[in-house]
Amino acid sequence: MISSCVTRCFGRGKCLPGPATASIYQTIRCISTNSNKAAEAPIFPKLEDVKMHELIGNNNFGKKTYYVERSRTGNLPVYSAYKNGGNKIITEIRKIEGDVIQLRNDLQEQLPFIPKKSWSVVMQSKKIIIKGNAVEAVKRVLTKKF
């Protein structure tokens, strides 16, 4: 049945009036109309039947989740820096992947002795900056979690 369809399409030259893609489309159309069960089974499911968790690449990382990557030597990326000629000390947390705001909120709950006004987030570089020297306290909390 398929061979007769192909010879019928290509033998007379009716399927090759335009570009090659049109001839392939005509051949597939000719084959699919002559087969009994091919047209009944859909190739793709309906859009309403597809669930969100079934999609490839759907992971919820970054929504209320975060990860602090350690350095090559295994240390946490928590650093102190001196600004304004050494008058101002700040603590930086770097290498944050995911939700930076959620990490800041969780750290604020674990470290209530640091005022909330002292915390700031730099979204472009994904850093958390704390006014004052809180390196040891932050490392202690992050060591328990990571």
UniProtKB/Swiss-Prot annotation:
The keyword Ribosomal protein applies. It comes from the Eukaryota. GO terms for molecular function: structural constituent of ribosome. Gene3D superfamilies: SUI1-like domain. GO terms for biological process: mitochondrial translation. It holds the Pfam family Img2. Coiled coil: none annotated. Keywords: Mitochondrion, Ribonucleoprotein, Ribosomal protein, Transit peptide. It is found in: Mitochondrion. Residues 1-38 form a transit peptide. Its main location: mitochondrion. GO terms for cellular component: mitochondrial inner membrane; mitochondrial large ribosomal subunit; mitochondrion. Component of the mitochondrial large ribosomal subunit (mt-LSU). Mature yeast 74S mitochondrial ribosomes consist of a small (37S) and a large (54S) subunit. The 37S small subunit contains a 15S ribosomal RNA (15S mt-rRNA) and 34 different proteins. The 54S large subunit contains a 21S rRNA (21S mt-rRNA) and 46 different proteins. Component of the mitochondrial ribosome (mitoribosome), a dedicated translation machinery responsible for the synthesis of mitochondrial genome-encoded proteins, including at least some of the essential transmembrane subunits of the mitochondrial respiratory chain. The mitoribosomes are attached to the mitochondrial inner membrane and translation products are cotranslationally integrated into the membrane. Belongs to the mitochondrion-specific ribosomal protein mL49 family. Present with 1700 molecules/cell in log phase SD medium. This is Large ribosomal subunit protein mL49. It comes from Saccharomyces cerevisiae (strain ATCC 204508 / S288c) (Baker's yeast). The gene is IMG2.
